Amino acid sequence: YVTNVLQSDSLIQIPAYYRILLFLPWDHSFAHTVGLYSFMYNGASLASVDYGQSGMEYLRNIPVNLQEVKPHILLSVPALAKNFRKNIEAGIKAKGRFTDKFYQLGLKMAYSYNGFGDDRGRGWKVLLKPLVKLWDILLFSKLRKQVFGGNLRFFVGGGALLDIELQRYYAALGIPMFQGYGLSEASPVISSNTPARYRFGSSGILVKPMDLKVCDEEGRELPQGQKGELWIRGGNVM
């Protein structure tokens, strides 16, 4: 775990003033490395959701604790991310047709401006920047405060493949969800997108130091672009 914390820090540096609210199981290596140890290593603060007397009470406590902690980073899995979106859009629709149309138009512009992530605001997209900024001031910043406390910078997603549409959606809200890739046996982080470099649908860039190659069934290394089995070597491998 110590090695993987140092490797993860090569991708995303966590300022000491950052806070995280952990609502993923603590017995998972993803929560251990990225949620607990990385924050401890950087002197940042962490909080957990009030468990309550049942699973349902635990889920009801999440929105309450988000407002109390006002986290800067959240760890998520696709099911939770979809549930957040469902609740956000239900709240928008409850405010009436005009608000919903305004919201949908803002999403459409942000999708165009963000592109695939790594081409955000480039070329003709720069013309959309004033409108994207306006919609952020009028709507999306308020949603971030109302739902997540107002300080959230980004999510780190793991546990399963993140739908590209879900990544586009949260980027449009101003809180991108960075997909990563890992294995429990690798402690678990192997790669991740980062605030400085991300692309929707990609699993990001490798942690450092770590060796990686793609091999065929016989263990022969394959050239770039070929599909095969992922082999890694590093101090994070159990």
Model regions and ranges:
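Conserved AMP-binding/adenylation subdomain of ANL enzymes
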Residues: 2-19, 23-140
